[in-house]
Every structure is written in C-alpha cells, then in structure tokens.
C-alpha cells in the first residue's frame, strides 16, 4: 500500500495539473470572448451612428434636390420673361420703323 499511495498521489497531482491547465484555457477563452463581445458592441454602436449619419445625409440630399428643382424652374421662368421682353422690344422697334417709313 505504501507504493500505491505515492502513485495515487502523483496521479492526483497530474489530474489536478490538467484540471488547472484546462481551467486556465477556459479563463483565457472567456477573456477573449469578453473582448470580442465588447468589440461587437462597439461595432454595433458605430454602425448605428453611421446609419444615423446616412439618414441625415439622405434627408439633406432630398432637400437639396427639391431646392435645385425650384431654383431651376425659377430661372427658367426668368429666362422666358427676358425672351418675351426682348421679343416685345424688337417688335416695337419694327413697328416704329414701319410706321415711320410709311409716314415719311
């Protein structure tokens, strides 16, 4: 029995050592997973902020498009008015020339 006691003791020590190694590995994996979860949460927050910025940019682009269309329409009408004024002036000048040439 004396010979079995040290063998049992060394087997228990080896088992304890393996258990400790396994526990250390588990602790290491748990730490890595905590870091990964933190990174995922940070990524989620950044994606959420990016999504908010994209929504704001889309709203700004839509507003810009509307304003640009209104401005285009405004200047198109201004251009039409200028053409109408120019044509009217030319017609009046032609009428004056014709009336002046007939009356002379």
UniProtKB/Swiss-Prot annotation:
Bias type Low complexity, positions: 7-16
Pfam families xrefs: Synaptobrevin (PF00957)
Covalent S-S links between cysteines: none
Keywords for this protein: Coiled coil, Endosome, Isopeptide bond, Membrane, Protein transport, Synapse, Synaptosome, Transmembrane, Transmembrane helix, Transport, Ubl conjugation
UniProt xrefs under SUPFAM superfamilies: SNARE fusion complex
Positions of crosslink type Glycyl lysine isopeptide (Lys-Gly) (interchain with G-Cter in ubiquitin): 70, 72, 81
Ranges for domain v-SNARE coiled-coil homology: 18-78
Signal peptide range: none
GO MF term list: SNAP receptor activity; syntaxin-1 binding
Transmembrane segments: 82-102
Vesicular side: 103-104
An individual GO BP term: positive regulation of receptor recycling
Compartments where located: Early endosome membrane; Recycling endosome membrane; Synapse, Synaptosome
Region described as Disordered: 1-23
UniProt modification remark: Ubiquitinated by RNF167 at Lys-70, Lys-72 and Lys-81, regulating the recycling endosome pathway.
Cytoplasmic face of the membrane: 1-81
GO cellular component: cytosol; early endosome membrane; neuron projection; plasma membrane; recycling endosome membrane; SNARE complex; synapse
CDD domains in the cross-refs: R-SNARE_VAMP2
Membrane topology, record value: Single-pass type IV membrane protein
PANTHER family assigned: SYNAPTOBREVIN FAMILY MEMBER
Function: SNARE involved in vesicular transport from the late endosomes to the trans-Golgi network.
Sequence similarity: Belongs to the synaptobrevin family.
Assembly and oligomerization: Interacts with POPDC1 (via the C-terminus cytoplasmic tail). Interacts with BCAP31; involved in VAMP3 export from the endoplasmic reticulum. Interacts with BAIAP3; this interaction is increased in the presence of calcium. Interacts with PICALM.
The protein, known as: Vesicle-associated membrane protein 3
């Amino acid at each position: 029995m004396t010979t079995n006691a040290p063998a049992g003791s060394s087997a228990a020590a080896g088992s304890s050592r393996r258990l400790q190694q396994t526990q250390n590995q588990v602790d290491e994996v748990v730490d890595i997973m905590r870091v990964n979860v933190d990174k995922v949460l940070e990524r989620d927050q950044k994606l959420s902020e990016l999504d908010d910025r994209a929504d704001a940019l889309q709203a700004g682009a839509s507003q810009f498009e509307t304003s640009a269309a209104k401005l285009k329409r405004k200047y198109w009408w201004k251009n039409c008015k200028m053409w109408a004024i120019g044509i009217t002036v030319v017609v009046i000048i032609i009428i004056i020339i014709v009336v002046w040439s007939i009356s002379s």
